[in-house]
Swiss-Prot record:
Compartments, record wording: Cytoplasm; Cell projection, Cilium; Cytoplasm, Cytoskeleton, Cilium basal body; Cytoplasm, Cytoskeleton, Cilium axoneme
Pfam families: DLIC
Stored SUPFAM superfamilies: P-loop containing nucleoside triphosphate hydrolases
InterPro entries (alphabetical): DYNC2LI1, Dynein_light_int_chain, P-loop_NTPase
Protein name listed in UniProt: Cytoplasmic dynein 2 light intermediate chain 1
Basic and acidic residues bias (residue ranges): 323-337
Function of the protein: Acts as one of several non-catalytic accessory components of the cytoplasmic dynein 2 complex (dynein-2 complex), a motor protein complex that drives the movement of cargos along microtubules within cilia and flagella in concert with the intraflagellar transport (IFT) system, facilitating the assembly of these organelles. Involved in the regulation of ciliary length.
Superkingdom, taxonomy of origin: Eukaryota
Lineage: Eukaryota, Metazoa, Chordata, Craniata, Vertebrata
Membrane-spanning intervals of the chain: none
Listed GO biological process terms: intraciliary retrograde transport; intraciliary transport involved in cilium assembly; regulation of cilium assembly
Family the entry assigns: Belongs to the dynein light intermediate chain family.
Chief location of this protein within or outside the cell: cytoplasm
Protein's gene: DYNC2LI1
Length: 351
């Protein structure tokens, strides 16, 4: 029997890769994506740099930023690649969420929501707006994927329940996020000095939200020990390293709860007297927790866009030649506006 030609070998390899991508669940794919969203100045960049072992000061994220990391699996084995996306501006740039979420990346995509624990009044609206916008975009991609590959879309919907045991008592009461979700509460060093009752409400609320969405929940700060634990969790998302099974639900310590290990019975009811809960008109359990939380921490009615600075004037993006040309063009524009204004006034006088 004649030996295979180089062309036949290459063709067989391509077909093999194609079939494995269609049949597998994405666990063996060497490229994964992690998308960081959350509170403005909440520490997202710091976490990413720590995970990538980059010793450099974090810079403010302007809009949507990208970087990547690589990990060696062994000798003569291709490196795993992790794509890290970060959305800046808190909730002011929701339109950019759709950019990294595509049908090509969704099967190996994860979301990390970083919430600033030191600003409890901003916590719920930040969390709600970002998760709703992200879920909306993911649902659109899954729906689009279903029209081309119904099997892949079906596998994604089934995978949503992978973190929840089949016999978990809360299984019928939850609504898992479409893709892996990790919620990180940052600035625990400030949060730990809060009044105990406030800490209790925040901890219980975040535990409920994380459990409802089938997400992991953990707190972090500048502490090296906590950053190492967070790094382990992110590495699991980015490179498929073994998932941690540790758990800490003590509100007097940094929470660390892996997805699927909490329960509604352990979390308990919303922290409000029964007679007060009865007065709240809620459409769903999530709505009830929201009303209870905002009773203690009413959201501040602020314009989320007012803090977004003009990047053209940001010194970290300075380019002398470009800036000089910009000044010149701005002056020319102002001169044109003045001359145009005079021309129109002259026309009005003549008429």
């Amino acid at each position: 029997m004649p030996s295979e030609t180089l062309w036949e070998i290459a063709k067989a390899e391509v077909e093999k890769r194609g079939s494995s991508e269609n049949e597998g669940d994405g666990a063996e794919i060497g490229e994964k994506s992690v998308f960081f969203i959350g509170s403005k100045n909440g520490g997202k960049t710091t976490i990413i740099l720590r995970c990538l072992d980059r010793d450099e000061p974090p810079k403010p994220t302007l809009a949507l930023e990208y970087t990547y990391g690589r990990r060696t699996k062994g000798h003569n084995i291709p490196k795993d690649i992790a794509h890290f996306w970060e959305l800046g501006g808190g909730t002011s740039l929701l339109d950019l969420i759709s950019i990294p979420i595509t049908s090509d990346t969704l099967r190996t995509f994860s979301i990390v929501l970083v919430l600033d624990l030191s600003k409890p009044n901003d916590l719920w609206p930040t969390m709600e707006n970002l998760l709703q916008a992200t879920k909306l975009n993911i649902d659109k991609v899954i729906m689009k994927l279903g029209k081309k590959n119904s099997k892949a879309a079906s596998e994604m919907r089934q995978k949503m329940w992978s973190n929840m045991q089949k016999d978990h008592p809360d299984r019928e009461l939850l609504d898992p996020f479409p893709i892996p979700l990790v919620i990180i509460g940052s600035k625990y060093d400030i949060f730990q000095d809060f009044d105990s009752e406030k800490r209790k409400v925040i901890c219980k609320t975040l535990r409920f939200v994380a459990h409802y969405y089938g997400a992991s929940l953990m707190f972090t700060s500048k502490s090296e020990a906590l950053l190492l634990k967070i790094r382990g969790v992110i590495n699991q998302l980015a490179f498929g390293i073994n998932k941690s099974k540790s758990i800490c639900v003590d509100q007097n310590k940094p929470l660390f709860i892996t997805a699927g290990l909490d329960s509604l019975s352990q979390i308990g009811p919303p922290p409000l007297p029964d007679n007060d809960i009865g007065k709240l008109h809620a459409r769903s359990p999530m709505d009830l927790w929201k009303k209870v939380y905002e009773k203690l921490f009413p959201p501040k009615s602020i314009n989320t866009l007012k803090d977004v600075k003009d990047p053209a004037k940001d010194p970290q993006y300075a380019e002398s030649e470009v800036d000089e040309m910009r000044i010149q063009k701005d002056q020319e524009l102002e001169q044109y506006k003045r001359s145009s204004s005079k021309s129109w006034k002259q026309i009005e006088l003549d008429s």
